[in-house]
Amino acid sequence: KCAKAIDQILHTPVSGYFYGINTTLEKAVVIEACKLGLHITTAESCTGGLAAGAITAVPGSSAVFDGGVVTYSNDMKKKLLGVRDETLRDFGAVSPETAGEMALGAIKLTGADIAVSVTGIAGPGGGTEEKPVGLVYIAAASKAGVTDHPSHPVLCHPSASVCSHFTSGDTDVTVLRCQFSDSRERVRTLSVKSALA
């Protein structure tokens, strides 16, 4: 009984953090993908490849991670991931719509089973009243029937909330809205941790 209670406490998000024993979030992602025989990919903007870097830092990650893309500019979001002009024009690069299209595009580009995308305003400049510094959208996409992750995302930070869920063809997409604070590096680090959760 005691061990079960301790395990539950250690695996519950507390103040935006996860606690575990003898592992990291990145390693847990790779191990779980290996167990399930799934391939994962990333599409990143404000994190500039940090999520892909975190995954590939895990030995054996090549069994589940074929690659990811960094699409910092709108032009690259369109060219590499197929984000639509009208999406960027009507909603902007930092929006749930763009995050969702980035994740869909990453699956189409790589053939992966699961994709996570991250787009946001890491700061210190660039924020507005409507879209302040620290605003980040994270999309999780999976081919239908592959996993329940997008349908039941882990809200790994107190500011995280589901803001969109849709299906496109055979792919389910869930988008989280997060509002982080602190330094540029902290925003980027929390974005990666939230994307991998």
Q: What is each stretch, according to the model?
A:
Residues 2, 6-197:
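Short alpha-helical segments enriched in small residues
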